Amino acid sequence: MDSRFLLALFLVLLVLGCEVQAAQQLQQDDPGSPALLGKVQESISSYWDTAKAAAQDLYQRTYLTSVDEKLRDMYSKSSAAMTTYAIIFTDQILTLLKGE
């Protein structure tokens, strides 16, 4: 695989991981310190904006049509496979519930 593709994939996963952590941290409200919560939210928002801008810049600099076509092809094949497996799984559950 191309190293640019792996780098872009790593950055996307890193950004998504940071977003999940930020969402979990924001759910844990501490009513005793609203000023601290505001500072944390502002800091996380700032980091998120910086990471998002860096990922977009990297994507624009390393954009390759062949990689884009491969990604679209992988997405279409994987979504078709998932649809097939979802139909099979649904059929198995219905058969199990009906008791045939």
Curated annotation (Swiss-Prot):
Biological process annotations from GO: lipid catabolic process; lipid transport; positive regulation of phospholipid catabolic process
Pfam family, one: Apo-CII
Signal peptide: 1-22
Keywords, sorted A to Z: Chylomicron, HDL, LDL, Lipid degradation, Lipid metabolism, Lipid transport, Secreted, Signal, Transport, VLDL
Region annotated Lipoprotein lipase cofactor, chain positions: 78-100
Function: Component of chylomicrons, very low-density lipoproteins (VLDL), low-density lipoproteins (LDL), and high-density lipoproteins (HDL) in plasma. Plays an important role in lipoprotein metabolism as an activator of lipoprotein lipase.
Family classification: Belongs to the apolipoprotein C2 family.
Protein name as annotated: Apolipoprotein C-II
Species name: Myodes glareolus
